């Protein structure tokens, strides 16, 4: 029985590696990928049930871990199969866009594409900033029907509108409680700054009418227009943004304006950049799994050369580097590897033999 499980695992994992190497953008291929992940989990589950703790030189996860991972694979497979029956099945879909990491990040339970970085500065402190992601395409699947909505940003947070209902998946007031002390913040997005002093609103929520104005990013023209801000009105002639409903705003990338909502979907940035706040990780939705390999510089150079035959198991590899501001006299060298998914990273660590003199550190990075 153990030999049978070993053979099935080898065939399954070979096909998974082929999927990484192919780097397909076809939805049907990704459906097959999640079927393979599901099969792999089933093999591990059965092996553990039989008391087998090592299979094909790999540590067999506990049954609880295999079951949880299999349930995720089943959910992704079913959602992708549903998406494949819609008009959006012919779009380009990458492995990362159909990964469990992106599917479960906010807004959870839906597929997302084309992230735009939203920077929020708390307490007026440039060193206290957090980066969030707004999505230009959010795919909502309900009863075999797929609806695509676009993300919006205002001083309250990041949200989308579906069937007339606003759904906020990031609320800046709650973020300010975690990362600030003065309960004030400002939002930087699409070349605009949304200033949000506490005096603008009370502890009660503003009405829908007060937050309905939306700004189209990067839709400029020239006209005589009125500048719009909270509590002030002025007239000037300049490049401007056109508001929905016919109202227009002056546009200046360096000018601070107080706005109700910003439509930031026109700027195609896929991943967020690093936040200066050390507690940032939970809010940045496009972080990439990484591994730091630490050790002697020559050892790492040789290891990096040998990693060439395992290219399907990681995305990119850095050159050898060191921290400069450190008291470490040994000057430990580092090579950083990035991965498409956590599964790819786990597969790398279980497949590639790392020398005992090299330390492995797992983490996440926004690139």
UniProtKB/Swiss-Prot annotation:
InterPro entries in the record: E2/EBNA1_C_sf, Nucleotide-bd_a/b_plait_sf, Papillomavirus_E2_C, PPV_E2_N, Reg_prot_E2, Regulatory_protein_E2_N, Regulatory_protein_E2_N_1, Regulatory_protein_E2_N_2
Signal peptide: none
An example Gene Ontology molecular-function term: DNA-binding transcription factor activity
Localization annotation: Host nucleus
Region annotated Transactivation domain, chain positions: 1-201
Annotated region described as DNA-binding domain, given as residue ranges: 287-367
Any one GO BP annotation for this protein: regulation of DNA replication
Function: Plays a role in the initiation of viral DNA replication. A dimer of E2 interacts with a dimer of E1 in order to improve specificity of E1 DNA binding activity. Once the complex recognizes and binds DNA at specific sites, the E2 dimer is removed from DNA. E2 also regulates viral transcription through binding to the E2RE response element (5'-ACCNNNNNNGGT-3') present in multiple copies in the regulatory regions of the viral genome. Activates or represses transcription depending on E2RE's position with regards to proximal promoter elements including the TATA-box.
Name of protein: Regulatory protein E2
Organism for this UniProt entry: Human papillomavirus 35
């Amino acid at each position: 029985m153990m030999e049978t499980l070993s053979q099935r695992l080898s065939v399954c994992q070979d096909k998974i590696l082929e999927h990484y190497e192919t780097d397909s953008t076809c939805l049907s291929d990704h459906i097959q990928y999640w079927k393979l992940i599901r099969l792999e989990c089933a093999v591990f589950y059965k092996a553990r049930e039989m008391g087998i703790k090592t299979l094909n030189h790999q540590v067999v996860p506990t049954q609880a871990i295999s079951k949880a991972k299999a349930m995720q694979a089943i959910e992704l497979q079913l959602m992708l199969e549903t998406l494949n029956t819609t008009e959006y099945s012919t779009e380009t879909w990458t492995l990362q866009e159909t990964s469990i990491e992106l599917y479960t990040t906010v807004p959870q339970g839906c597929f997302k594409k084309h992230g735009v970085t939203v920077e929020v500065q708390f307490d007026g402190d440039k060193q206290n900033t957090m980066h969030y992601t707004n999505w230009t395409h959010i795919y909502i699947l309900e009863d075999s029907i797929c609806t695509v909505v676009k993300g919006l940003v205002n001083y309250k947070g990041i949200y989308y509108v579906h069937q007339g209902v606003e759904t906020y998946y990031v609320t800046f007031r709650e973020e300010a409680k975690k990362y600030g002390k003065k309960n004030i913040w400002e939002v930087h997005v699409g070349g605009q700054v949304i200033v949000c002093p506490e005096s603008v609103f009370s502890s009660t929520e503003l009405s829908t009418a007060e937050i309905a104005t939306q700004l189209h990013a990067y839709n400029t023209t020239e006209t005589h227009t009125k500048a719009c801000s909270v509590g002030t009105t002025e007239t000037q002639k300049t490049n401007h943004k056109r508001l929905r409903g016919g109202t227009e705003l002056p546009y200046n990338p360096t000018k601070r304006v107080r706005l109700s909502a910003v439509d930031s979907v026109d700027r195609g940035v896929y991943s967020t950049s690093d936040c200066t706040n050390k507690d940032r990780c939970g809010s940045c939705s496009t972080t990439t799994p990484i591994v730091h390999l630490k050790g002697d510089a020559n050892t790492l150079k040789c290891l990096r050369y040998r990693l060439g035959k395992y290219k399907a198991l990681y995305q990119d590899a850095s050159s050898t580097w060191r921290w400069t501001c450190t008291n470490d006299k040994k000057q430990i060298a580092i090579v950083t590897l990035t991965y498409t998914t956590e599964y790819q990273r786990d597969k790398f660590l279980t497949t590639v033999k790392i020398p005992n003199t090299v330390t492995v550190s797992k983490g996440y990075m926004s690139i």
